From Swiss-Prot:
Protein purpose: Located on the platform of the 30S subunit, it bridges several disparate RNA helices of the 16S rRNA. Forms part of the Shine-Dalgarno cleft in the 70S ribosome.
Gene Ontology CC terms, in alphabetical order: ribonucleoprotein complex; ribosome
KW Kinase (keyword) present: no
NCBIfam families with a match to the protein in the record: PRK05309.1, uS11_bact
Residues annotated as transmembrane: none
Swiss-Prot/TrEMBL GO biological process terms: translation
Source species: Polynucleobacter asymbioticus (strain DSM 18221 / CIP 109841 / QLW-P1DMWA-1) (Polynucleobacter necessarius subsp. asymbioticus)
Quaternary assembly: Part of the 30S ribosomal subunit. Interacts with proteins S7 and S18. Binds to IF-3.
Name of the featured protein: Small ribosomal subunit protein uS11
Record-stated family: Belongs to the universal ribosomal protein uS11 family.
Xref: PANTHER family: 40S RIBOSOMAL PROTEIN S14/30S RIBOSOMAL PROTEIN S11
Length: 135
């Protein structure tokens, strides 16, 4: 009896990933000073693929390099191409060093970039910023 329950529980966990077929989507590039996160979604905002610099094996200060952002964008872009992505609208957020290289990596995969937006949040004099670093 216990074996039947465990077999059904295992089949629920090992569900096959459903491949979506979407022609155009949005690439969200979040480039902070410490890491770069690339998420590719459809027009409704449902995630198709994502990758981070840290997830590609870069640790510490190497996560925040343009090359790490390029590798992460290539991984996310290849997974999106498998879902049928042809056109991408790119939304860049943050001041990090991986902004430009992530967009170039997506472009080099053969995906047509239709629009590039900078959606970095800018405060209208909101919270007090942290004090300056003195080195």
């Amino acid at each position: 009896m216990a074996k039947q329950q465990s077999a059904s529980a295992a089949s629920q966990r090992a569900r096959k990933k459903v491949k979506k077929n979407v022609a155009d989507g949005i690439a969200h590039v979040h480039a902070s000073f410490n890491n770069t996160i690339i998420t590719i979604t459809d027009r409704q905002g449902n995630a198709l693929s994502w990758a981070t610099s840290g997830g590609q094996g870069f640790k510490g200060s190497r996560k925040s390099t343009p090359f790490a952002a390029q590798v992460a964008a290539e991984v996310a872009g290849k997974a999106a191409v498998e879902c049928g992505i042809k056109n991408l609208e790119v939304q860049i957020k943050g001041p990090g060093p991986g902004r430009e290289s992530a967009v170039r990596a997506l472009n080099s995969l053969g995906i047509k970039i239709t629009e590039i937006q900078d959606v970095t949040p800018v405060p209208h004099n909101g919270c007090r910023p942290p004090k300056r670093r003195r080195i």
